[in-house]
Regions:
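N-terminal secretory signal peptides that target proteins for export/translocation
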Residues: 1-12
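Membrane-interface interhelical loops and short amphipathic "cap" helices
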Residues: 38-73, 124-143, 194-210, 261
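Hydrophobic cores of alpha-helical transmembrane segments in multi-pass inner/ER membrane proteins
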Residues: 80-90, 112, 146-162, 216-229
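Juxtamembrane boundary at the C-terminal end of a transmembrane helix
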Residues: 255-261
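Boundary of Sec targeting at the N-terminus
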Residues: 33-36
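Membrane-interfacial loop-to-transmembrane alpha-helix junctions, especially the N-terminal start
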Residues: 98-112, 171-180, 236-246
Length: 261
């Protein structure tokens, strides 16, 4: 029965992983194009009116804008808490693994929970929270598409690392899937659309701050991808990178926890 479970799990991941990689590659031009279009539309609106960064901003009440701001900050903070927890579990694993073997599965579960949360709660204008369909949101709003792409990447990381922790995926090359996915996520962050969060007279300052914060996320993400890959590679520095990898997870978690718009 166990060999059958191993075969099913491994064959499923082997089928899903290439599809995920192809999907991400196909999404990259669309993400960049949507972001560029939104930026061009925003600049054109600024030249015409110089009052609001987006045409539909005037239709949104201050209460709605404040609610959206708080929702976005909460989402980042909760994701940061889960990433922070993942780093703590990973650092503590060496000390308590002998007494609590299941702790090895704790940090992948943090990524799974984060992915599920982002998938469901990142855009509450979509069904079932509101009437807007997922198809419309994904095809008309770059930010929605990016959020769901992040969710899929987090879920993929969680599933693969959980299967590795349980001993289902034993091949050494599975250890390099995390760095590859983390690299893709970091690249997407560089194209992340922030147009919907900049409103009011100081919207340019808000935009610069949000872009700066997401650049910090991306740079830390690249560091996480690099150190995780080196931690999986046999070398004299392997032990060092195994410690540095969860440390950078703590850094990313802290950056997400202090995120403000």
């Amino acid at each position: 029965m166990r060999p059958l479970k191993f075969f099913v799990s491994q064959s499923l991941v082997l089928r899903v992983l290439p599809l995920l990689a192809i999907t991400c590659l196909l999404l990259m031009p669309q993400l960049a194009r949507c972001t560029d279009d939104a930026s061009s539309h925003d600049m054109s609106g600024m030249h015409d009116g110089m009052s609001m960064p987006m045409d539909n901003s005037a239709d949104e009440t201050p209460a709605k804008l404040l609610a959206d701001k708080r929702e976005s900050e909460f989402n980042h903070h909760l994701a940061g808490l889960l990433v922070l927890a993942a780093g703590i579990f990973m650092i503590a694993e060496g000390n308590i693994r002998a007494r609590r073997p299941l702790v090895r599965q704790a940090w992948p579960l943090c990524f799974l929970l984060s992915g599920l949360f982002v998938l469901v709660f990142s855009d509450t204008e979509l069904w079932p929270f509101n009437s807007q369909s997922w198809y419309f949101g994904l095809t008309h709003h770059a930010e929605v598409l990016q959020h769901k792409a992040f969710a899929v990447l987090l879920l993929a990381l969680g599933v693969i690392e959980l299967l590795r922790a349980r001993g289902t995926l034993k091949a050494g090359w599975w250890g390099y899937v995390f760095p590859a996915i983390a690299m893709v996520g970091s690249v997407i962050l560089l194209f992340h659309d922030h147009q919907g969060h900049a409103h009011g007279a100081d919207h340019m300052e808000v935009m610069r701050r949000i872009q700066s914060e997401h650049l910090g996320f991306a740079v830390t993400g690249f560091g996480i991808a690099l150190t995780k890959g080196l931690a999986e590679t046999p070398s004299a520095w392997r032990a060092f990178f195994k410690r540095l990898f969860p440390t950078l997870l703590l850094v990313l978690g802290a950056l997400l926890l202090v995120y403000v718009e």
